[in-house]
Amino acid sequence: MALLQIAEPGQSPQPHQRRLAVGIDLGTTNSLVAAVRSGLAEPLADGDGKVILPSAVRYHPQHVEVGESAKLAAASDPFNTVLSVKRLMGRGIADVHQLGEQLPYRFAAGESHMPFIETVQGAKSPVEVSAEILKTLRLRAEQTLGGELVGAVITVPAYFDDAQRQATKDAARLAGLNVLRLLNEPTAAAVAYGLDQKAEGVVAIYDLGGGTFDISILRLTGGVFEVLATGGDSALGGDDFDHAIADWIIQQAGISSDLDPSAQRSLLQAACAAKEGLTNADHVELSHGDWRGTLSREQFEALIEPMVARSLKACRRALRDSGVELEEVSAVVMVGGSTRVPRVREAVGELFGRTPLTNIDPDQVVAIGAAIQADTLAGNQRGEGEELLLLDVIPLSLGLETMGGLMEKLIPRNTTIPVARAQDFTTYKDGQTAMMIHVLQGERELIADCRSLARFELRGIPPMVAGAAKIRVTFQVDADGLLSVAARELGSGVEASIQVKPSYGLTDGEIARMLQDSFQNAGDDKAARALREQQVDAQRLIEAVEAALQADGERLLDAEEREVIELQVQELRDLLASNDGLAIERQSKRLSQVTDAFAARRLDSTVKAALAGRNLNEIEE
């Protein structure tokens, strides 16, 4: 008799078999794939034994080349070789023009202002280019592990916004990968170090890669990784070090900065080689065309000092946001190839007062942490006592527009995700049957100073007096940091929703600027918000009084009384355009006082009309 093999939902019917899942570090300069094998997370090598895959894609008429060979062809075939595509993920064509010289490609605008790179195979989007890198890593993993993958955890900078995260997920799907989760790169590093060293306390993750910088302050307690605060710069990395050296060479050689793409590639390759050489040497020899020169480590450190200072400023801001003092930080983890620069390690050590941890290869630590998380999400059993919980946070507050152009925050920045928050709102005018929901991101009090994410309309609200309808708006951020918003009128049940997928992301430095502006303008913003609220309340009062005058003015007021009220209404209306909040408040009170008697008469009239023709017994019943 045959036996029916059964298993608990979500478990393998053969528990000794592990589901194959990987962690992928999709980097600006280099990418890696790692997996847990025999209980240890390790990067997976290609056929030549190399674990690092340069994030370079070269397009030929009939095929695509990815990795080291593509990178080497960048100087000879710059238009068909795409480097640092991560900088373009989720960006718009306007952002591309701002990057200018750093991107020697031929661009064309596509749908929703998405930039496309012109190649011999036609126009390619950043998502398609990234998909080629991910596809190469997927094939490497499947060949090494000997089977198909159930999914992958892909890391992204903590500062990636919704558009950039969605673009990453789209690239993964195009590459044939099931995304188990998008994981913030600093959090992935914490996973790797937390499991290896059983660390507890407050840890700073300093992540300086090729194109982005992230700083995260985490509290590690009993296997729980809680991100207290994040910060960074979406346009700061090792590529900027290369450009600093390239600019120095141009100045020293006395040549024009207006180089053709091939010469620009050659110059940047020479600059990158010099940067790497100065990690262990005191000076390096350089050449460009007929020029020969020497760059010392001291000169190099002077060139990059402003960039290092920018990263340290972000560190101090993240510490302030987390409420943690410098002396409370028990460890500093270095992540990213650019942290090999001696001056970077020295400056970070000086700031935190301790030697940074570099136990795990800074190029590999993120992929290793992602592999550990992927192994867990795939359902593979962990060893006893190795439970793992990750608590990421959102980098900027999320909210919506209210009357007066005000930003009402529903989810404050640094809130742990996944999260859902709801708040009730109401209508502003009598008979209002629709409401525009304007979703915003930012720290300022006025919508003009925040970033618009999306708009959608809730229709079918039953007509009723202003303030009677109750509309519940729910914001939900999933584990990948993607936002969905729903609005529902509680009485009728009508609802509308939207998943926020902006057509392109924030411009370079915009997130950092938004945070900095919020700190610098906090006092002014509160005053401006108070003024707007007073103006909205005053406008509502004016509309209510005018509606009452139109309905009952002739019947309940004599000419003199009506003239007094209308005069006070006009004075308040004249004040609305001013910035004198105190005067608006005083005049609103004055108008309320002069209409008290009118309001009482209207109430009496309404009660009399309701009781007319009815006896006492009917009323008591």
UniProtKB/Swiss-Prot annotation:
Q: Which organism is it from?
A: Ectopseudomonas mendocina (strain ymp) (Pseudomonas mendocina)
The GO terms describing molecular function are: ATP binding; ATP hydrolysis activity; ATP-dependent protein folding chaperone; unfolded protein binding
Q: Which UniProt keywords apply?
A: ATP-binding, Chaperone, Nucleotide-binding
Q: Which family does it belong to?
A: Belongs to the heat shock protein 70 family.
Q: Which GO terms describe its biological process?
A: iron-sulfur cluster assembly
Print the organism lineage.
Bacteria, Pseudomonadati, Pseudomonadota, Gammaproteobacteria, Pseudomonadales
Q: Which HAMAP family match?
A: HscA
The answer, when asked if DNA repair is one of the entry's keywords, is no
Q: Give the protein's biological function.
A: Chaperone involved in the maturation of iron-sulfur cluster-containing proteins. Has a low intrinsic ATPase activity which is markedly stimulated by HscB.
- This protein's source sits in the domain of life called Bacteria
Protein name in the entry: Chaperone protein HscA homolog
Q: Name one Pfam family in it.
A: HSP70
